[in-house]
Regions:
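Compositionally biased terminal segments of proteins
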Residues: 1-265
């Protein structure tokens, strides 16, 4: 069992608190052999975050640059990052409670669906939304995740393959026309492969730029915190996580806003 599955089990030892996401979720869906970091979506409650920090404390984890694992920041869409050593392996863990591009209703549905699962993991459809990042490689992953879906509506909205979309349009022409309002490039699905591929490329660039703008808003808001972080990191070096957390939280107050001025992008 990988360390990331072990951690997932520990996080959820006495109740569902953490759902495996991002690269490790891609591994669990058998679309990758490995991923170097671990990402989780956490329940947004002080009790859940306390439990996660306790697990990390037992692993002798330390904070990396990011927001404190505190509900005041997490509800603003910030992320928290930690690291620990396991023999020769450097284990990095990343956490959010409000992942990008998932609505509140969709996130609530994810928690309902994963209740009782042996290994809670983000499903392919939602994972495809999370993978709409500014990294080129993630769009190939979205394409493969879409091929795991059975619902033609979801396939139309997420597929990255011109060939797949044209085949779908031949099978479901009315649905393709209906969904063209939500995804305009579907208007090209009955034309040429070249036109549809060009539309897919343009859409990918648009999605990448949108995520770049989202990240820039957080980076700009975090500039005072980033400036002070080296001193904070030196202050907490060698401290147990439970003590380091108190220091990080106290130092972040007033430097890192709980929420962005215009809300979560």
């Amino acid at each position: 069992m990988s360390i990331y599955l072990e951690l997932t089990n520990e996080f959820n030892a006495d109740g569902l608190r953490a759902i495996l996401s991002s690269g490790q979720a891609v591994v669990l869906h058998r679309l990758a052999v490995m991923s170097k970091d671990g990402d989780w979506i956490l329940r947004e409650s002080p009790e859940a975050l306390d439990a996660i920090r306790n697990v990390l404390d037992r692993r002798c984890a330390h904070y990396r640059y990011g927001a404190p694992l505190d509900v005041r920041w997490m509800r603003g869409g910030w992320s928290s990052h930690f690291e620990f050593r396991l023999d020769a392996l450097r284990v990095r863990t990343d956490f959010v409670t409000r992942p990008p591009r998932l609505t509140a209703d969709d996130l609530a549905g994810l928690w309902r669906e994963q209740a009782g699962c042996a290994t809670p993991v983000v499903d392919p459809r939602r994972l495809a939304e999370l993978k709409k990042t500014n990294r080129e490689k993630d769009y190939a992953v979205i394409g493969e995740l879409t091929r795991l879906l059975d619902d033609p509506r979801q396939q139309f909205l997420l597929s990255r393959s011109a060939q797949d979309l044209m085949a779908l349009a031949r099978t479901h022409p009315n649905l393709a026309r209906q969904l063209a309002t939500a995804r305009p490039l579907l208007e090209q699905a009955g034309r040429s492969v070249e036109a549809l591929e060009a539309a897919l490329d343009a859409e990918r660039r648009k999605l990448m730029h949108a995520n770049e703008r989202r990240l820039l808003r957080y980076m700009t808001a975090a500039e005072p915190w980033a400036e002070h972080w080296p001193a904070v990191a030196a202050e907490i070096a060698g401290l147990p996580l439970r003590q380091a957390h108190a220091v990080v939280t106290a130092r972040a107050e007033g430097l890192l806003p709980f929420e962005l001025p215009d809300g979560i992008p």
